[in-house]
Amino acid sequence: MERLICVLVGYVFGLIQTGYLYGKKNGVDLRKKGSGNAGTTNALRTMGWKAGGVTLLGDCFKCVAAVVVVHMIYGKTHTDMMPLLSMYAGMGVVLGHNYPFYLKFKGGKGIAATAGLIISTTNIWIVLICLVAFIAIVATTRYVSLGSMTVVTIYLISVIVYGQHGGFHVENVAYLHEMYGIATFLMILAFWRHRANIKRLLSGTENKISVGGKDKK
């Protein structure tokens, strides 16, 4: 039951579509612009740096907020489960972000929300590794999609390595295995949401990042 509650808490926070709300406030419906995606990259491409920054921070923060709420609910009674429950909350946020019911289940791709999960459940070194990898790949290739998929892959590997070395301070091995399963699910989901990007990357037609206008080839 605790797991389900955490997923539901996360899903509610995930429903806060930062990019969509910011766009509506400024007379732009992200679902009808650019890629039609309600996430950070489309906000950046369609409305510029400010919109991209606001969307990124908002989508990251909602995951951090969900984890904080879960800690408030279960922190004193489920100490050994907290890393696991935090990940369930993060998974719920990603699901809410990707599949918001009030937008006909058409949301973002969950990368910024996953970044919030990385920030709130791992350590500074994993955060820095993911950040540096993302910046390096986007700076050299200008493919945000490639950087995003690299980050979720690094996240999965990091969760397993961190967990196997006692980083989560979880005594129940079954909890660790669940955490690895959640990280695997999030990686697979991210790749699924980027399936069109993967096809374009393989064919050499993927759009390169640009701001406030048309993507460059």
What spans do the regions from the language model cover?
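Helix-coil boundary and interhelical linker segments in multi-pass alpha-helical membrane proteins
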Residues: M1-I5, V67-Y88, I119-I126, V161-G181
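N-terminal signal-anchor transmembrane alpha helix
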Residues: M1-K25
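Hydrophobic residues within alpha-helical transmembrane segments
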Residues: V9, L57-F61, A133, T150-T153
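Alpha-helical transmembrane segments of multi-pass membrane proteins
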Residues: G10-G14, G90-H97, F134-V138, V159, ...
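Cytosolic, membrane-interface loops and tails of multi-pass inner-membrane proteins
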Residues: Y20-G52, G107, K199-K217
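Short, non-helical or kinked segments that cap or interrupt transmembrane helices
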Residues: D29-T40, Y102-A115, Y143-V152
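Interfacial segments of multi-pass membrane proteins
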Residues: L44-W49, V70-Y74, I111-T141, I154-G163
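Multi-pass membrane catalytic core of lipid/isoprenoid biosynthesis enzymes
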Residues: R45-H71, L84, L103
